[in-house]
Regions:
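Hinge/capping helix and adjacent helix->loop/strand transition within the periplasmic-binding protein
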Residues: 1-54, 103, 107-114, 122-159
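Glycine-rich beta-alpha junction loops
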Residues: 41-45, 63-67, 84-90
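Extracellular/periplasmic bilobal clamshell ligand-binding domains
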Residues: 154, 172-206
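Alpha-to-beta junction loops
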Residues: 8-11, 53-62, 75-79, 147, ...
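Mature extracytoplasmic/periplasmic domains
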Residues: 85-91, 103, 148, 152, ...
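C-terminal lobe and pocket-closing loops
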Residues: 70-151, 189-192, 200-206
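Short helices/loops that flank or line small-molecule/ion binding pockets
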Residues: 26-31, 46-60, 65, 69-76, ...
Length: 206
């Protein structure tokens, strides 16, 4: 971590501007107090892995699936500096031995913690299933049960593993998702700060 913070102009590859991966990259660089970090957006999935392997970028904020798929832990080809629990409190036992600090440990103020909570919330939800207001409860319950059954179906689990190179599915079930949505900050100050990280302007001062 000390070497990372001492370096200037670290190139961080990320998804396109506005994507949750792009926002995570900018928020991480901000909270870790990196010196003049260069966020390089525009990469899609495997393209970023290739750029990282070629040395076109110095760092990336990667999902646990990406790390496991490329066996980066056992090969010891990269350094890990921090983790982002998504949602908060959900830990991956495969990385426990690394003893990584959570990114929230670097948040200094309530404002920064709210920013992080908003980022986590949007990242946790992914693609949401929405129903219009006043939808009868019995219909809501039917959809919830359908989601639960889908994600616990052995056929779904096997297909997921096949598509992700053996990664385990960790779905956010309906009631958990509702809790995450409810806890996303809605105050104007946090929203405006979040917009600055979602855009392509310079990172704000701390």
């Amino acid at each position: 971590m000390a070497k990372l913070r001492a370096a200037s102009g670290v190139r961080i590859g990320s998804a396109p501007v506005g994507h949750t991966g792009y926002i995570q990259s900018r928020v991480s660089a901000y909270l870790l107090d990196l010196k003049e970090p260069r966020i390089i957006p525009g990469y899609e999935n495997e393209d970023l892995d290739v750029a990282f392997a070629r040395g076109e970028v110095d760092a990336q904020v990667a999902s646990t699936g990406t790390v496991i798929e490329h066996d980066l832990v056992n090969k010891k080809l990269v350094d890990f500096h921090a983790a982002i629990e998504v949602p908060k409190g959900r830990k991956d036992s495969r990385f426990a031995h690394l003893n990584l600090p959570d990114i929230e440990d670097f948040a200094k103020t309530d404002k920064e913690k709210k920013l992080l909570n908003m980022m986590r919330g949007f990242r946790s939800i992914g693609t949401a299933l929405l129903l219009p207001p006043a939808t009868p409860k019995d219909r809501v319950d039917i959809l919830k049960e359908a989601v639960r059954k889908t994600h616990s179906d052995p056929a779904f689990v096997n297909e997921y593993r096949k598509l992700t190179g053996g990664d385990e599915p960790t779905p956010l079930m309906p009631d958990e998702q509702a809790k995450v949505v409810k806890e996303i900050p809605r105050d104007a100050e946090t929203i405006e700060l979040f917009k600055r990280f979602a855009g392509n302007g310079p990172l704000p001062p701390r």
